[in-house]
């Protein structure tokens, strides 16, 4: 069955889907990390692929930018294609002073300025948290790989060019590790659908210091994050 935004056939997606924002990043993951990967969807050029990693079937698909786009794809994957787990893999800007460029952050919870989860949760505040099983496996995978991963709260912003930069003072006070644009929505959709979600991020720039990574540095650290995610999928 196809949906308005996904034209894959039934059974095309694995139980677990990696979800970068950029569809070309999804293609990169499929070509460089998955074996025998095949493209399964391409509506609006939002590419999706399925292959295997260490013998286990895994899919990867882009989400686009922001909570609305990510929520559409996550809902359709969970509801129409039998996907059980979505792991977002992406970049973020750091606000905490002790977070460095290229650090890996695992989002235990996701605060947000979006009202999407309030709409979903009948006007109340919803605690948008990762699925514990996925979180535990990712932490263990990072430890086994010798990669230091920071675990904590992240912030999903509705605006990239914020008109209120003073918000970063508040985020730093509350020990928010990084800022991105999708996780809170993904966690809300997973809860609504009774499924599982996790967000693993690489720090691409530091909002407080103005530091930025080069494209080569982003690629290297992004690969570390991907291996954590993939190894967590095949963990028993």
UniProtKB/Swiss-Prot annotation:
Reaction(s) catalysed by this chain's protein: a purine D-ribonucleoside + phosphate = a purine nucleobase + alpha-D-ribose 1-phosphate; a purine 2'-deoxy-D-ribonucleoside + phosphate = a purine nucleobase + 2-deoxy-alpha-D-ribose 1-phosphate
PROSITE patterns hit by this protein: PNP_UDP_1 (PS01232)
Annotated positions binding phosphate: 21, 25, 44, 88-91
Organism encoding this protein: Psychromonas ingrahamii (strain DSM 17664 / CCUG 51855 / 37)
InterPro entries: DeoD-type, Nucleoside_phosphorylase_CS, Nucleoside_phosphorylase_d, Nucleoside_phosphorylase_sf
Protein family membership: Belongs to the PNP/UDP phosphorylase family.
Name of the protein described by the UniProt record: Purine nucleoside phosphorylase DeoD-type
Site feature location: Important for catalytic activity: 218
């Amino acid at each position: 069955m196809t949906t308005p935004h996904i034209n894959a056939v039934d059974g095309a997606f694995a139980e677990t889907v990696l979800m970068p924002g950029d569809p070309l990043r999804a293609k990169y993951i499929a070509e460089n990390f998955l074996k025998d990967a095949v493209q399964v969807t391409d509506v609006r050029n939002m590419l999706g692929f399925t292959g295997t990693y260490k013998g286990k079937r895994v899919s990867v698909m882009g989400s686009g930018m922001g909570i609305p786009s990510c929520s559409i794809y996550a809902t359709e994957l969970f509801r129409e294609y039998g996907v059980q787990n979505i792991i977002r893999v992406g970049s973020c800007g750091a606000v905490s002073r002790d977070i460095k460029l290229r650090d890996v952050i695992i989002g235990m919870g996701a605060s947000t300025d979006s009202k999407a989860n309030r709409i979903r949760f009948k006007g109340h505040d919803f605690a948008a948290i990762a699925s514990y099983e996925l979180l535990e496996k990712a932490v263990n995978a990072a430890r086994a790989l010798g990669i230091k991963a920071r675990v904590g709260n992240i912030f999903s912003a509705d605006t990239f060019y914020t008109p209120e930069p003073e918000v970063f003072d508040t985020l730093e006070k509350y020990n928010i590790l990084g800022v991105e644009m999708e996780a809170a929505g993904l966690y809300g959709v997973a809860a609504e659908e009774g499924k599982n979600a996790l967000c693993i991020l690489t720090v691409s720039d530091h909002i407080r210091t103005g530091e930025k990574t080069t494209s080569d540095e982003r690629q290297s650290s992004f690969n570390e994050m991907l291996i954590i995610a993939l190894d967590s999928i095949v963990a028993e």
